[in-house]
């Protein structure tokens, strides 16, 4: 999978979504067909996210380690790689060193 460098034809919510005392910051984008994504960055930390809808997390820069709910194994993902998170679940993410830039594809 190649790295998504830009998203065309979107409306961007200018106020950022700020989570975990600023360790994760994202902006919501909406396409003309009503679908949405978020584009963000996670600073070095270990965080736990909960999901409503299924998500595909696409790495744009940096790297992270991810552990899905109910699993004991951490998997590493970098730029150009993605991982899937089921809906109504959670995942732990660890970022060390450089910030991890991502696109979250919902649904």
Curated annotation (Swiss-Prot):
Matching SUPFAM superfamilies: RmlC-like cupins
Coiled coil feature spans: none
GO MF assignments: guanosine phosphorylase activity; purine-nucleoside phosphorylase activity; thymidine phosphorylase activity; uridine phosphorylase activity
A Pfam family it matches: Ppnp
Transferase listed as a keyword: yes
Organism from which the protein derives: Azoarcus sp. (strain BH72)
Assigned protein family: Belongs to the nucleoside phosphorylase PpnP family.
Gene Ontology, cellular component aspect: cytosol
Protein function: Catalyzes the phosphorolysis of diverse nucleosides, yielding D-ribose 1-phosphate and the respective free bases. Can use uridine, adenosine, guanosine, cytidine, thymidine, inosine and xanthosine as substrates. Also catalyzes the reverse reactions.
Reactions catalysed according to its record: a purine D-ribonucleoside + phosphate = a purine nucleobase + alpha-D-ribose 1-phosphate; adenosine + phosphate = alpha-D-ribose 1-phosphate + adenine; cytidine + phosphate = cytosine + alpha-D-ribose 1-phosphate; guanosine + phosphate = alpha-D-ribose 1-phosphate + guanine
InterPro entries: Ppnp, RmlC-like_jellyroll, RmlC_Cupin_sf
Cited PANTHER family: PYRIMIDINE/PURINE NUCLEOSIDE PHOSPHORYLASE (PTHR36540), PYRIMIDINE_PURINE NUCLEOSIDE PHOSPHORYLASE (PTHR36540:SF1)
Keywords: Glycosyltransferase, Transferase
EC id: 2.4.2.1, 2.4.2.2
Protein name: Pyrimidine/purine nucleoside phosphorylase
């Amino acid at each position: 999978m190649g790295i998504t460098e830009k998203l065309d034809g979107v409306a961007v919510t200018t106020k950022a979504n700020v989570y975990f005392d600023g360790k994760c910051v994202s902006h919501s984008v909406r396409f003309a067909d009503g679908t949405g994504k978020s584009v963000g960055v996670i600073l070095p930390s270990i965080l736990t996210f909960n999901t409503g809808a299924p998500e595909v997390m696409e790495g744009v820069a940096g790297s992270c380690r991810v552990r899905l709910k109910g699993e004991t194994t951490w998997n590493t993902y970098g730029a150009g790689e993605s991982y899937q998170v089921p809906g109504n679940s959670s995942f732990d993410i660890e970022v060390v060193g450089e910030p991890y830039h991502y696109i979250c594809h919902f649904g």
